[in-house]
């Protein structure tokens, strides 16, 4: 079994008559469309398996009807699974008796919906405290805790206002505060920010990320906004037709999309904001070592010409970057009869970039630099190079 705070194994949900027959037909290779046409059964979720780590924000994405909202409701059993298992902290939620399931939801789970679902007759404080009221906490205890979480989301001064007196973003903050009030270890958020305008949505993303830094919780976040997923997600799971097509970090999926469906999700993404120098580096620039004696200019010139390369990098015996030199400059030295060694005074100094430098910052450096730029690892050693050609190819998705 996979490890994690939440582990989903071979999960299915079939709506309609004879659900087990529909699962058997899926395993035989029938499409969900054929099963619907010939058996009248709708496949909501099909053989989904994945895990979510403790303290992770795991984002589920997919087109409308791909099964995202059904899947998260199978995890907390608002919808009963047809087959499969859901483990939370090692406990199989799919097999729990109703009383234990209710206790688990009250103690350990919260959910935030796209519609704020605030009670209009209750003030902000009472809305935030509602989960604690259901859990049987005293008025004093729940109001104290509700004020704490309202403070966290920046709404303490609005505690005695009513929902109609708040903006949409503020109402969603109340919904988030209500989810946090019971101090759950996991939160399920179903397109929680999608009804907000772009500025308010980003503001709520900032609130969530800030709260996560202060008190890390396990969060499953459903979104249709790829920029949102890239910004807040530790990992992203992409669904299509009830199946989980790919799971990975934003960088992993950008670099290695599973298929065209996944690739199309990222067509509008500015990759330079999410990739780093380390992910773009290559060994495309010939490397020569200054090991107490500088490389010979004629030898370097001949090798560059043979490789059809225009630049060379020089490193010392410990792989520290020493400098760069162009084929044009070396050729002039050689043609002038000066087949001397490439000592430091002949090299061009270029400040290397660290592997974790975001690509948008790398682009700025490439624009002002004539040739490729060197990349160094965490220990300061040379680890590769980035050229303009390499950058353009990567941004084109090649």
Regions from the PLM with identified roles:
Residues 19, 24-34, 91-92, 129, ...:
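Conserved ABC ATPase "signature" region
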Residues 247-248, 256, 324, 385:
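ABC ATPase "signature
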Residues 84-92:
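Conserved ABC transporter NBD signature motif
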Residues 287-310, 314-318, 331-334, 351-398:
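The conserved cystathionine-beta-synthase
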Residues 241-242:
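Conserved ABC ATPase "signature" C-loop
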Residues 162-166, 170:
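Conserved ABC ATPase signature
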Residues 181-185:
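A short, proline-enriched helix->beta-strand linker immediately N-terminal to the Walker B motif
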């Amino acid at each position: 079994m996979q490890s994690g705070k939440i582990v989903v194994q071979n999960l299915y949900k079939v709506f309609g008559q004879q659900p087990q027959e529909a699962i058997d037909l899926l395993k035989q290779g029938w499409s969900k469309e054929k099963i619907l046409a010939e058996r009248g059964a709708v496949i909501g979720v099909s053989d989904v398996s994945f895990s979510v780590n403790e303290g992770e924000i795991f984002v589920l994405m997919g087109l409308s009807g791909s099964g995202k909202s059904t899947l998260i409701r199978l995890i907390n059993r608002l919808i009963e699974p047809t087959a499969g298992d859901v483990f939370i902290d090692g406990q199989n939620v799919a097999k729990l008796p109703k009383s234990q399931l209710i206790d688990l939801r009250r103690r350990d789970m919260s959910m935030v919906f796209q519609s704020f679902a605030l009670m209009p007759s209750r003030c902000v404080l009472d809305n935030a405290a509602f989960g604690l009221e259901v859990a049987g906490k005293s008025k004093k205890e729940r109001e104290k805790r509700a004020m704490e979480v309202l403070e966290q989301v920046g709404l303490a001064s609005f505690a005695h206002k009513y929902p109609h007196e708040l903006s949409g973003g503020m109402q969603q903050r109340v919904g988030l505060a209500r989810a946090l009030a019971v101090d759950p270890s996991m939160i399920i958020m179903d397109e929680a920010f999608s009804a907000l305008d772009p500025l308010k949505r980003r503001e709520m993303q900032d609130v969530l990320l800030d709260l996560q830094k202060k008190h890390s919780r396990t969060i499953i976040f459903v979104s249709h906004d790829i920029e949102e997923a890239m910004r807040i997600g530790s990992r992203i799971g992409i669904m299509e037709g009830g199946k989980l097509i790919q799971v990975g970090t934003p960088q992993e999926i950008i670099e290695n999309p599973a298929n065209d469906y996944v690739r199309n999700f990222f067509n509008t993404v500015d990759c330079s904001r999410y990739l780093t120098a380390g992910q773009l580096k290559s060994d495309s620039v010939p490397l020569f070592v200054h090991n107490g004696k500088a490389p010979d200019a004629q030898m370097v010139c001949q090798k560059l010409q043979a490789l059809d390369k225009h630049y060379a990098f020089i490193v010392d015996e410990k792989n520290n970057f020493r400098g760069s030199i162009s084929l044009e400059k070396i050729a002039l030295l050689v043609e002038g009869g000066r087949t001397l060694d490439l000592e430091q005074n002949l090299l061009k100094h270029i400040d290397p970039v660290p592997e974790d430098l975001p690509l948008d910052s790398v682009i700025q450096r490439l624009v002002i630099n004539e040739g490729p730029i060197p990349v160094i690892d965490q220990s300061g050693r040379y680890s590769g190079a980035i050229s303009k050609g390499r950058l353009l190819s990567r941004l084109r998705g090649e």
